[in-house]
Design a protein with these regions (language model features):
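Charged, low-complexity intrinsically disordered segments
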Residues: 1-157
Length: 157
């Protein structure tokens, strides 16, 4: 049976990048994998630090989005490097938190989907998938890149 995750407070919410699992990277602590991922889009140390210092993952995401017009991003959205960066962030999260690594391993062999139902932005459908309203366990639209990353990480850890 497929596993769908969406919000941190819901079942399997620990899979998402907004979940509060700090990550050590480059000698610094990042509050979430989302903050680290967003910072990797930039080369400017001031922007990177501003993203890292945000108290919430949504704050980190908003700073990253607002910085697009200020400085040049080094990573384009939805590029191969963008996906590799996400995979690294997700792998670090699970390597550094054995409690959730064990939970992720326990999902095998189920397919994992980031639930993008009711979201229609290109970015949402890149990372996730929408459910079929007639058969809620089946995806109907979306690349589900995040789910694919989680399943690859599950095989590694």
């Amino acid at each position: 049976m497929p596993i769908w995750f969406k919000k941190v407070a819901e079942p399997y919410g620990w899979m998402g990048n907004m979940a509060p699992y700090p990550i050590q990277y480059a000698g610094k602590t990042w509050r979430t994998s989302e903050a680290l991922f967003q910072s990797l889009r930039y080369a400017d140390p001031a922007i990177i630090e501003q993203i890292r210092e945000q108290k919430s993952p949504m704050g980190a995401k908003l700073v990253a989005k607002s910085s697009v017009n200020i400085v040049h991003r080094v990573i384009d959205a939805m590029s191969p490097q963008y996906v590799l960066n996400m995979e690294m962030c997700v792998l670090l999260k699970f390597q550094q938190h054995p409690d959730i690594a064990k939970l992720l391993k326990a999902t095998d062999p189920n397919l994992i989907y980031e639930d993008a139902t009711n979201r229609n932005k290109v970015n949402d459908l890149f990372w996730g998938a929408q459910r079929d309203t007639n058969n809620p366990n089946e995806p109907i639209k979306g690349q589900n890149t995040m789910g694919e990353i989680l399943m690859r990480v599950r095989a590694i850890i």
